[in-house]
Design a protein with these regions (language model features):
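Cysteine-dependent hydrolase recognition
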Residues: 64-86, 126-133, 216-217, 223-230
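Loop/turn elements at helix/coil->beta-strand transitions in domains of secreted/extracellular proteins
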Residues: 126-130, 148-154, 193-195, 223
């Protein structure tokens, strides 16, 4: 486990260094043009994260289909809950799985681990050397540098970039508390300038939000994000 963790950490550093080394200093604008837009509706009303990944895979030239990814690659756990000996509500890990059915309005959400697994299993099946990397915790400077490098970033945000409201949650079998909010959303960051960001949204399409609004919401979701890298 130690070696694996060291490799992942080293890989993250390499990603950031690769991004820094190819940047123009003080760049104020960058956008990925002709980015494919895929709408999650009507097939996947709660499948925003996997639809965001579908867009990124299509950007890299893969024949990815959202429903194929959702039902053949995305780790899914049934929405089964119970109370433990301490009377705590317990259920599946929202980070590792999509909880529920993304094809219904009753589905919940999933985290970066689930999206990375779906991406990596798909990429392996395609015989690709690309792989997904969880870069959660990235700084905003580093985040925007990926866009300058024409690397789209799957980001965990909120629907319509609204401030995150009240959350609900439960404990996993390992005792970790996981939470979700009704309007939790996944999308793709594809551009930015001094005042705004451009988002490829699985519901709204290509849309701009103020940079301050985006950064506030992105931070409220823990700076969670994923990229694909060779």
């Amino acid at each position: 486990t130690e070696n694996i963790n060291e490799k992942i950490y080293s890989e993250k550093i390499d990603v950031f260094e690769d991004s820094r080394n190819t940047q123009k200093e003080n760049a104020k604008y960058a956008k990925i043009d002709d980015f494919p837009i895929v709408n999650q509706m009507p097939e996947l009303p709660t499948g925003c994260e996997i639809t965001a990944l579908t867009m990124v895979l299509q950007y890299y030239g893969f024949p990815a289909e959202k429903t194929d990814l959702a039902y053949n690659y995305l780790p899914i756990a049934s929405a089964s809950f119970y109370y433990d000996e301490e009377n705590r509500l317990c259920g599946p890990d929202l980070n590792e799985y999509f909880v529920g059915d993304p094809g219904t309005v009753g589905g919940y959400i999933c985290g970066t681990e689930a999206i990375c697994k779906a991406a990596n299993d798909y990429l392996k099946a395609q015989g690709s050397s690309l792989h997904a990397i969880d870069i959660s915790g990235v700084s905003f400077d580093e985040l925007y540098q990926f866009i300058e490098n024409k690397t789209p970033v799957v980001v965990w945000v909120m629907l319509e970039m609204a401030i995150r409201g009240g959350t609900k949650g439960w404990y996993t079998q390992l005792g970790e508390y996981v939470e979700w909010s009704t309007n939790d959303h996944g999308a793709v960051l594809i551009g930015y300038d001094e005042e705004a960001v451009t988002i490829a949204d699985p519901i709204c399409g290509e849309i701009q939000y103020s940079m301050q609004q985006f950064e506030t919401v992105f931070s409220s979701r823990g700076n969670k994000c994923v990229i694909l890298k060779d």
